[in-house]
Amino acid sequence: MASDSPARSLDEIDLSALRDPAGIFELVELVGNGTYGQVYKGRHVKTGQLAAIKVMDVTGDEEEEIKQEINMLKKYSHHRNIATYYGAFIKKNPPGMDDQLWLVMEFCGAGSVTDLIKNTKGNTLKEEWIAYICREILRGLSHLHQHKVIHRDIKGQNVLLTENAEVKLVDFGVSAQLDRTVGRRNTFIGTPYWMAPEVIACDENPDATYDFKSDLWSLGITAIEMAEGAPPLCDMHPMRALFLIPRNPAPRLKSKKWSKKFQSFIESCLVKNHSQRPATEQLMKHPFIRDQPNERQVRIQLKDHIDRTKKKRGEKDETEYEYSGSEEEEEENDSGEPSSILNLPGESTLRRDFLRLQLANKERSEALRRQQLEQQQRENEEHKRQLLAERQKRIEEQKEQRRRLEEQQRREKELRKQQEREQRRHYEEQMRREEERRRAEHEQEYIRRQLEEEQRQLEILQQQLLHEQALLLEYKRKQLEEQRQAERLQRQLKQERDYLVSLQHQRQEQRPVEKKPLYHYKEGMSPSEKPAWAKEVEERSRLNRQSSPAMPHKVANRISDPNLPPRSESFSISGVQPARTPPMLRPVDPQIPHLVAVKSQGPALTASQSVHEQPTKGLSGFQEALNVTSHRVEMPRQNSDPTSENPPLPTRIEKFDRSSWLRQEEDIPPKVPQRTTSISPALARKNSPGNGSALGPRLGSQPIRASNPDLRRTEPILESPLQRTSSGSSSSSSTPSSQPSSQGGSQPGSQAGSSERTRVRANSKSEGSPVLPHEPAKVKPEESRDITRPSRPASYKKAIDEDLTALAKELRELRIEETNRPMKKVTDYSSSSEESESSEEEEEDGESETHDGTVAVSDIPRLIPTGAPGSNEQYNVGMVGTHGLETSHADSFSGSISREGTLMIRETSGEKKRSGHSDSNGFAGHINLPDLVQQSHSPAGTPTEGLGRVSTHSQEMDSGTEYGMGSSTKASFTPFVDPRVYQTSPTDEDEEDEESSAAALFTSELLRQEQAKLNEARKISVVNVNPTNIRPHSDTPEIRKYKKRFNSEILCAALWGVNLLVGTENGLMLLDRSGQGKVYNLINRRRFQQMDVLEGLNVLVTISGKKNKLRVYYLSWLRNRILHNDPEVEKKQGWITVGDLEGCIHYKVVKYERIKFLVIALKNAVEIYAWAPKPYHKFMAFKSFADLQHKPLLVDLTVEEGQRLKVIFGSHTGFHVIDVDSGNSYDIYIPSHIQGNITPHAIVILPKTDGMEMLVCYEDEGVYVNTYGRITKDVVLQWGEMPTSVAYIHSNQIMGWGEKAIEIRSVETGHLDGVFMHKRAQRLKFLCERNDKVFFASVRSGGSSQVFFMTLNRNSMMNW
């Protein structure tokens, strides 16, 4: 045995002198990893005896450790409770490759204590078993401690069992012999959960030491592991456990079922102060160890249990016991299954054989000894021949048995696979049927909707035809009446004339002689002086005159009334009551057919009512039908003509006495500086829950006088083209005084929101075309008709026909709009979306009304015109953001619920009591909005630009570290949305009330606090559009940036402890986050493209250098580059390359159980490496997939159901999978709707899906698929703009960095959780994230980069 040979010091061990194992031992299979090498099950070639063989590379660095391990094993393994060392061999390798050392040790076939626990019901051992195993461990430790050796890694995995239930300690890789003088160590080695507090302290404090009593703490933890199935704190991260072990009280058994003796034993082992912890010999005398029942009985029970476990597994010849190392593992109990190979007898003989091999080359000193040995050899050979014959027979039987088992297993596997295939096929068939059924239902639903839509349109057309016929009949009837009346009047005049003539004749005949003049009465005479016949004639004329054409002054007075709504208010609702009640119209003066009385509580005039002759009956019926059908009309022409010749529309209708609807000219209120808007005031209630949908204005239509020939005679028309006001201009579109009818009623009221659209919709073509800034004026059909009509035509039929045609068209659009309910989305981040508060007339009972201004940010389009960022003109697709009519307060939030997960902000004004001039600045509550365009003012101080600025507390920085130096500096990012009130449900009418109530929570407090300011602002037309936000700092997630500007572009970064390693175009730096933000240069003139810190392995993985090699840097070497406190480290090379890989594009480190995989994307291949612990301590090749059809740009690795490894990679065409076992490659998602190449952004393996489902992000979309290419969710994640960088963060969210905003979305649903707007467009790149902090970098035009970090802690996310 090893003990027979004289103990040699480390220097005396000559590794090169050891024999080659070829022909003596062969390796069977890998069973685990030791601290410095891999452990194999091996077999002695001649005898078939099994042995555990640890294989290690002999490198210069680790030669001392290897010699130390050999020395330890040779000296101290000769004990019944320690796995015996048999011998060592050297396997020579060709030059350039390290030689391999084979350490041959006793093989323990029953596995480890951890395996025993796993295979026991309830994962707990019986108390007498625990006592037996603890006693055996103590015996082994006692032997080591007597020889001044600390094991330093006692745990369940390092305590093995033989098939006879003998207990053996293994893994001396970390054992250390105590110096005879000092007797203490201060190195940090061991497994975190079993580690003693004093061992952990030695890492934190270099002066701390420990001794052999640390093994007794580990024994106590192992006893708890045997009792409870796992060590304390095992559910925590190892680093967290290391932090807590010295700080927490000593652990105890949770259950009260254990005996007092056992609990006392645990307490004795787990004493935190190691100086007070009992010694090994004292613990041997503890009642729990000393007073044990029949040991033989316990061993029999254990042996039976081991045998039963083997039978249950069907004697699978799979992984044997995993000889685990202690390289700061993150999990404590991942080992292989126990061996199923029977441990053959004759171990002592085998030991003698090994001894003979070791002593064969020794000189025989004495002839007598030689003769004795020869005689002994002859006897042994005779004995050996007998044994060999027996063993050969047993081995053949065993081989036959194994063949039978393998055959049986193979059949079972095939059967199982076949069943799985059947199940999968059945499941796929079921899913296909389900999909077909769903598709059929969708198609039926779609057809049904189409039919309903067509039916509705037919009904509307029929109603329109009926109304048109009714109007024509009424008109003809009136004409006939007028004609008859005229004929009657002519007849009467003729009779009067005849009567007068006959009277004259009579008088002449009566007085033929007298030539007296006839009596002529003067017009100025009093009625009493007129003769009776004249009075009679006058009376008749007066009666007739009541039905004669109107007097000019009457017309003039009516028309100049400012409160007559212009045509642009058609289809708007100016009252707050539900619009389903038919309009109550005053009787029409039959001789003034062009004017219709307007009642504010009912709906405003329709397009055809506002100008033409409208009989009362036909009008009422038509209006009622219109309102019942729909409350909303799209705004197809809202901004389609920036230079249309129409005067500015009034921004609100003055409150006035409801008993006198039509004011006289002298009642016109004094004019105030006009703030014109791009929409009619009647739109203000377009989103109230009462009507449930937006009512769009008919912008650009002529006011009432423009289409009425009578009015044209009465008033001059001034048609000055209004120029389009750009967002940077300061000209105010004030109205000339020669337009009293259009300006008369305008007050600085609140604005209705212009619903900005993001999508070009098929059913609203006029809305979908962007308007160029210098487009010539185009006059709409109605306008051209109204403006060019020279005088009153003989018949109104043509005018009525035209208006009815326009009405029919709008009604069709209305119905399409109502059916489709399109989302109103913010088209451009630069468009101001100020909340608008309606301030039109309230109901007479003073009841407040609620409406919501919503902004949809989930779909910010990629259709922004090319000149938008650089020029002053701010365009939206399908809708010009700043019209000739100022949109400073017109761009309010509007819209309905989004079908696509669109974020809504609701506002209720129910808390507010509005006065006649309420909300003159257009702000009700303030949300944090984009701050992209500077506020401009007209000479009179009137705000005229399209985008107001909203500054918030979160934008005003209090310290120099937040976005610059001074507190007045504006933030680079503006939190845009409050996620507490966002709604992303599908569009259902019955959900609108819920949204309104959610809105109340958001703005009620804000509205009250802003009320005083707004009341003051309402009195004047110059408004402060920079109100101070009253929300505290903590309400919004913070974004901060470090002052340091990097001269070259930041490409990647990784957290190392609390500090940040930053990789740039020309070097690697460390940003000291714990101190003053100082930056240390670590490596110069080398490009770093990607990096990850693996602190447990002491490495930094990078893609770096001109050739994009995969380099692994040692963290200890990098640390020494800053501290320069270890000359030994400085001498060594600080990095190694992984393989000979060049041209790496992307990699991903994937941790699965205790294995760390490195998946690497190359030019047309994917390589998989796996981390090999000491003695290798490097990534070693695992699998390679070359000559791929698609070039991988992005890679990830998933483990399906804990069994099948699959590589997922993204390319320019889509996303693909490689089955690691078979090497087969197939597509899982190809976006066919995108022509040309795509940019893959991210692959997110979804949690709780057994590695089967993922979210793949590309371009501005994300799709949910599984590893077989099936779409798993009907949802498509839609970014608001094309992101430059996308990353999954561990709060189960995904973030996208665009040039205009940062979006945060839920990984599970794709719903928007928040948006951060940038003050200006900038390119951002994700760097890394940990816990609640996300780091990213900006790149400016000058090439300087800065590091930002965003804190998304839970509390602020809840309040945000």
Curated annotation (Swiss-Prot):
Q: Where is the active site?
A: D153 (proton acceptor)
Biological process terms from the Gene Ontology for this record are: actin cytoskeleton organization; cytoskeleton organization; intracellular signal transduction; MAPK cascade; microvillus assembly; neuron projection morphogenesis; positive regulation of JNK cascade; positive regulation of protein phosphorylation
Record EC number: 2.7.11.1
Question: Domain named CNH: which ranges?
Answer: 1047-1334
Q: Where in the cell is it found?
A: Nucleus; Cytoplasm; Recycling endosome; Cytoplasm, Cytoskeleton
- Catalytic activity line of the entry: L-seryl-[protein] + ATP = O-phospho-L-seryl-[protein] + ADP + H(+); L-threonyl-[protein] + ATP = O-phospho-L-threonyl-[protein] + ADP + H(+)
Chain intervals with Acidic residues compositional bias: 317-335, 834-847, 987-996
Q: Where is the composition biased (Basic and acidic residues)?
A: 288-307, 652-669, 775-789, 814-827, 908-917
Q: Which InterPro entries match?
A: CNH_dom, Kinase-like_dom_sf, Prot_kinase_dom, Protein_kinase_ATP_BS, Ser/Thr_kinase_AS, STE20_Ser-Thr_kinase
Please give the SMART domains that the UniProt record associates with this protein: CNH (SM00036), S_TKc (SM00220)
PTM comment text: Autophosphorylated. Autophosphorylation is activated by RAP2A and induces association to the cytoskeletal fraction.
* Mutation effect (K54A): Kinase dead. Loss of autophosphorylation and loss of function in cytoskeleton regulation
Q: Write out the ranges of the annotated region (Mediates interaction with NEDD4).
A: 290-1047
Q: Which residues carry this modification: Phosphoserine?
A: 324, 326, 560, 570, 600, 608, 610, 640, 678, 680, 688, 701, 707, 720, 764, 766, 769, 959
- What superkingdom does the record give? Eukaryota
Q: Has the keyword Signal been applied to this entry? A: no
Q: Where is the composition biased (Low complexity)?
A: 720-755
Q: Which residues form a coiled coil?
A: none
Mark the residues carrying the PTM Phosphothreonine: T187, T581
Question: What cellular-component terms does GO give this entry?
Answer: apical plasma membrane; cytoplasm; cytoskeleton; cytosol; extracellular exosome; glutamatergic synapse; nucleoplasm; nucleus
Task: Provide the assembly information.
Answer: Interacts (via the CNH domain) with RAP2A (GTP-bound form preferentially); the interaction is direct and required for the activation of TNIK by RAP2A. Interacts with NEDD4; recruits RAP2A to NEDD4. Interacts with TRAF2 and NCK. Interacts with TCF7L2/TCF4 and CTNNB1; the interaction is direct. Interacts with TANC1.
Which disease shows up in the entry for this protein? Intellectual developmental disorder, autosomal recessive 54: A disorder characterized by significantly below average general intellectual functioning associated with impairments in adaptive behavior and manifested during the developmental period. MRT54 patients manifest intellectual disability, delayed speech and hyperactivity.
For this entry, the protein name equals: TRAF2 and NCK-interacting protein kinase
Organism listed in the record: Homo sapiens (Human)
Q: What gene does this protein come from?
A: TNIK
